[in-house]
Amino acid sequence: MTFKITTLFFLLAVSISFSQENLTYQKPPKSILDLADYQRAPSVSMDTKKVYMLLSYRNTYKTLDDLNQDELRLGGLRINPITNISSSVTYINNLKLRKIDGKDEIQITGLPENPKIANLQWSPNETKIAFTHTTQKGVQLYVIDVATAVASRLLNDNLNANLGSPFSWYPNNSQLLVKLLPTNKARLIDPKKDLPTGPIVSNASGTKSQNRTYPDMLKNKSDETNFENIITSELHTYSLNGTAALFKAADMYAGQSFSPDGNLVMITTIQKPFSYIVPLSRFPSTAIVYNLNAIAIKTVNQTPLTEIMPKGFMAVAKGKRNMSWRTDVASTLVFTEALDAGDPATKVDFRDEIFLWKAPFVENPTSLLKTPQRFGGIT
């Protein structure tokens, strides 16, 4: 009797295991599927003249392939080390144009097969739209001609989209400043195969500070090397006619922005030392203004590593912050400085002061206004 029962359980177990070998993902009944598997409404982007609308369509959910991609988490970034773009980006799968005063949607032709579109950016005169397309190997650059609704590829899959926008339009509307992977890009260190060369050492300054815990921080020297690797780019100028030229050699570029008159460009780079307790937004950085021949005009900001901050949601770092070009004049920077040393517990009449700094930056910045509370922005 015992033998028969044991045999029966064995046969049942074998039957269950065999029945599960070829199990695949199943679809729910149609009534449930209709509720869950719906088509998302497109996102809308309009030109400032209110002539065209760009309709961006996305999948309702990420695919299993999207969720199964490699991911590297360093310095607060989550990137795909194969394609060199954020692993959390939600891609656009189709683009259409529509005139504001019309009803017909115009399908944009020339889009890549199985589009994975991101980083949409209108040209300054709004006659072109640039975007990236992610392939299995990397990130490509496309440009749409709005008048004809035709997209064409400008660059193959070697853009670096790991940090910030991978490209910026020149104000002349015929060129783009593009971040490319370095020609001599080093391989990433595999922590499972490459042994560390020494211990991890942390030094305490003796200063009290209440820091929140951030995810995806750097943990060791291998992480530091890999972090520097993934954010290092070369800056190249690409014309819509296909010509190209190196603008700046490889560096850890965090951002680039042109002055409204198109004669200057402010380029921000990440500096060392890195930190194991705060993300890259608080790493040291340097902002330098260049002319269009890549000659440095002025170092306009140097931000130190900021691991210690005052308590409170209104706490900010000391020094210049939120530096950008004033959009209604030729080449003037606008930035903010805290008047309370960044500490909201300090009692002051004014928290922030906003400054204007006119190129070529030989004179001191001039005060625009002071705010009793923390400055948020000007429109």
Where are these regions (language model features)?
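Beta-propeller folds
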Residues: S19-T379
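Bacterial Sec-dependent N-terminal signal peptides
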Residues: M1-L23
